[in-house]
């Protein structure tokens, strides 16, 4: 986990050498998948391709910064359980009690760390392709709505939860 000069957390999810087959053989380039977050509810992801690794990472990071979205957090976890989907990938995200930690793998873990979630249970279903898992996770996170937002939509007063 590395922080840049703006206090953003940058995580490399996937770095691949890809080949384009041309008449004279194969032409290689690099593909990078990066997640950027502020550790306080904002997160974005980007993909970059270039002839050199640093350039691919730079492009991916720029795209990630441009596409950042806000995620509602409640005490370092999610407000409620959510299922995100993209392609064959499904990602189940469950809120967890304090001290649980981030129980997630690969791309899901990178997003959770970047967005600032400390306690969560996650399961990727259907695929382990980092691109689809990442997009499914982002779909789940962007579908989350805060209690304040929902109460405003419904024109109701927000009450304390019943125990």
UniProtKB/Swiss-Prot annotation:
One of its GO terms (cellular component) is small ribosomal subunit. Signal peptide: none annotated. Disulfide bonds: none annotated. This is Small ribosomal subunit protein uS5. With S4 and S12 plays an important role in translational accuracy. Located at the back of the 30S subunit body where it stabilizes the conformation of the head with respect to the body. One of its GO terms (molecular function) is structural constituent of ribosome. The N-terminal domain interacts with the head of the 30S subunit; the C-terminal domain interacts with the body and contacts protein S4. The interaction surface between S4 and S5 is involved in control of translational fidelity. NCBIfam families: rpsE_bact. InterPro entries: Ribosomal_Su5_D2-typ_SF, Ribosomal_uS5, Ribosomal_uS5_bac-type, Ribosomal_uS5_C, Ribosomal_uS5_N, Ribosomal_uS5_N_CS, Ribsml_uS5_D2-typ_fold_subgr. Residues 8-71 form the S5 DRBM domain. Keywords: Ribonucleoprotein, Ribosomal protein, RNA-binding, rRNA-binding. SUPFAM superfamilies: dsRNA-binding domain-like (SSF54768), Ribosomal protein S5 domain 2-like (SSF54211). It holds the Pfam family Ribosomal_S5_C. It comes from Oleidesulfovibrio alaskensis (strain ATCC BAA-1058 / DSM 17464 / G20) (Desulfovibrio alaskensis). The lineage of its organism: Bacteria, Pseudomonadati, Thermodesulfobacteriota, Desulfovibrionia, Desulfovibrionales. Part of the 30S ribosomal subunit. Contacts proteins S4 and S8.
């Amino acid at each position: 986990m590395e922080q840049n000069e703006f206090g953003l957390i940058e995580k490399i999810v996937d770095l691949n050498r890809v080949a384009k087959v041309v008449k004279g053989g194969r032409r290689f380039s690099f593909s990078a998948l990066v997640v950027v977050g502020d550790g306080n509810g904002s997160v974005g992801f980007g993909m970059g391709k270039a002839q050199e690794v640093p350039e691919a990472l730079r492009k991916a990071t720029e795209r990630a910064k441009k596409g950042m979205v806000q995620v509602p957090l409640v005490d370092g976890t999610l407000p409620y359980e959510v299922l995100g989907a993209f392609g064959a990938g499904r990602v189940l995200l469950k809120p967890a009690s304090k001290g649980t930690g981030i129980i997630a793998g690969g791309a899901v873990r990178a997003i959770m760390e970047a967005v600032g979630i400390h306690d969560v249970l996650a399961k990727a279903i259907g695929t382990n392709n980092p691109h689809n898992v990442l997009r499914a996770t982002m779909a789940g996170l962007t579908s989350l709505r805060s209690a304040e937002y929902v109460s405003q939509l419904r024109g109701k007063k927000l009450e304390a939860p019943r125990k």
